[in-house]
Amino acid sequence: EASGETFVAENDACKCGSDCKCNPCTCK
């Protein structure tokens, strides 16, 4: 579950997915 929280934090910080503002986008 800890990995899940880290992923969420990383994703939220990078806003990756449908709205990727990171360039290059390092979010998985």
Curated annotation (Swiss-Prot):
Which molecular function term from Gene Ontology is one that the record holds? metal ion binding
Highest taxon of the lineage: Eukaryota
Q: Name the family the entry cites.
A: Belongs to the metallothionein superfamily. Type 15 family.
Q: State if Metal-binding is listed as a keyword.
A: yes
Q: Which Pfam families match?
A: Metallothio_2
Function statement: Metallothioneins have a high content of cysteine residues that bind various heavy metals.
Q: Could you confirm whether the keyword Phosphoprotein appears in this record?
A: no
UniProt keyword annotations, A-Z: Metal-binding, Metal-thiolate cluster
Organism source for this protein?
Answer: Brassica napus
Q: Which InterPro entries match?
A: Metalthion_15p (IPR000347)
Classification lineage: Eukaryota, Viridiplantae, Streptophyta, Embryophyta, Tracheophyta
Q: Identify this protein by name.
A: Metallothionein-like protein type 2 LSC210
